From Swiss-Prot:
Protein name per its UniProtKB record: Histone H1-beta, late embryonic
Species name: Strongylocentrotus purpuratus (Purple sea urchin)
Pfam families, alphabetized: Linker_histone
SMART domains, per database record: H15
Ranges annotated as biased composition (Basic and acidic residues): 95-107, 114-123
UniProtKB keywords: Chromosome, DNA-binding, Nucleus
Region of interest called Disordered, as start-end residue ranges on this chain: 1-22, 81-211
One Gene Ontology term from the biological process aspect of the record: nucleosome assembly
């Protein structure tokens, strides 16, 4: 039973037939636009015409709205005292005064300065990181450049070995130059001529036969 009662209590409230008394008072003063201020009677008449209100019951709430409006500064009492007299809209309703705007402007300036400082710090950090990366890359390039000449020096001895290979062929050339030695043997052939001379000398024996 208690749960059912709670559910019944949670039903949405009916919307009010009119706005709050303070809102109706402000609407009445803005609509009347009287230079000398709007009287309490004129405000009540405007509310009675434009809103579905029991003006007798609402009169007390209208008086309270006028008094609280003057205390808060939303309304200015031009004439009279309390809830009687004439009323105008206060400066707070029309807009913030210069004294109130100054702190807001100062706060905005501080926030803007903080944002700028944060951006500058981030930019400085990013620049420092970029410079470090650039320095590392430059150091790597220099180490690579130093290592390259060492590789060239290692290749040079191989070229010298290739140059020494023709020196091994020189002994073959000497052998080819030594081949003319058999030509000397051919030059010794005049010995055969000597044998022919000996054969030519044989007729001397014939001379002995003649004797």
């Amino acid at each position: 039973m208690a749960a059912e009662q709670k559910k019944v209590a949670k039903k949405p409230r009916a919307k009010p037939a009119h706005p709050s008394s303070s809102e109706m008072v402000l609407a009445a003063i803005t609509a009347l636009k009287e230079r000398g201020g709007s009287s309490a009677q004129a405000i009540r008449k405007y509310i009675e015409k434009n809103y579905t209100v029991d003006i007798k019951k609402q009169a007390i709430f209208i008086k309270r709205a006028l008094i609280t409006g003057v205390e808060k500064g939303t309304l200015v009492q031009v004439k009279g005292k309390g809830a009687s007299g004439s009323f105008k809209l206060g400066k707070k309703k029309e807009g913030k005064s210069d004294a109130q705007k100054a702190p807001d402007a100062a706060k905005k300036a501080k926030l803007a300065a903080k944002k700028k400082e944060a951006k500058e710090k981030k930019a400085a950090r990013s620049k420092a990181k970029k410079e470090k990366l650039a320095a590392k890359k430059a150091s790597k390039k220099t180490t690579k450049k130093v290592k390259k000449p060492a590789a060239k020096k290692a290749k040079k001895p191989a070229a010298k070995k290739a140059a020494k290979k023709p020196a091994a062929k020189k002994p073959a050339a000497k052998k080819a130059a030594a081949k003319p030695a058999p030509a000397k043997k051919a030059a010794k052939k005049p010995a055969a001529k000597k044998a022919a001379k000996k054969v030519a000398k044989k007729p001397a024996a014939k001379k002995a036969a003649k004797k």
